[in-house]
């Protein structure tokens, strides 16, 4: 019996490590993707005076233990209820504290901890069911539960949500990440099937999200004017053939210049792109552990 218990514990650890690896890889791949309009990438800081690519990479790596612990907690608990929600909330706050220690107080990935933490936990709950829509729907069920220990929010995102009447990251999660599942992922797959390279396919996925998302990061920095510039500009790139086409590339440069002039950085869309990359890879890597659980 001890050998069986030890094997089960090893398999659970492997699952948690794999999911944490996927989440961190998604964050790093999102950060390194270039050229992203007004976002930190290999070219520079975008619209952010306090961020750079190395900081984004270090921040992502600092979150590995947080994601691992979230996966382990979800697998141990085995069901979606208020107790699991409370545990995940505390782990998320601990992860945010670790991030802030790494970045010396700069908020690099607060929104990503929320989005990817939910998706990691959702994947760990039912490791044999890894299709994007199913995982996102489970994450939404977790997000619908309130965390009684959470502080009353007065973040930029919360203030923007109240001022402009938009849903923000909380609603996106509670709805099962529709901008990622219904817009980002389908565009990623279409661009790949159309012959675009992986980097261009990912850029197109980001643009698809930007075209429909009420991004609270953009609203905070540039209001409705900035949001319209982001959404209209992203649609124009895709309508011109996407980032892999010459016309689309020109439109992308125009969008980058416009958002930089407005100091508008689509950080919410970037978080959802990372969610897309996580969900996209999950079925391909799950075979190594799903069949053993």
Swiss-Prot record:
Keywords: ATP-binding, Nucleotide-binding, Transferase. It catalyses: 3'-dephospho-CoA + ATP = 2'-(5''-triphospho-alpha-D-ribosyl)-3'-dephospho-CoA + adenine. Its EC number is 2.4.2.52. One of its GO terms (biological process) is prosthetic group biosynthetic process. InterPro entries: CitG, TriPribosyl-deP-CoA_syn. One of its GO terms (molecular function) is triphosphoribosyl-dephospho-CoA synthase activity. It holds the Pfam family CitG. Involved in the formation of 2-(5''-phosphoribosyl)-3'-dephosphocoenzyme-A, the prosthetic group of the acyl-carrier protein of the malonate decarboxylase. Belongs to the CitG/MdcB family. PANTHER family: 2-(5''-TRIPHOSPHORIBOSYL)-3'-DEPHOSPHOCOENZYME-A SYNTHASE, TRIPHOSPHORIBOSYL-DEPHOSPHO-COA SYNTHASE. This is Probable 2-(5''-triphosphoribosyl)-3'-dephosphocoenzyme-A synthase.
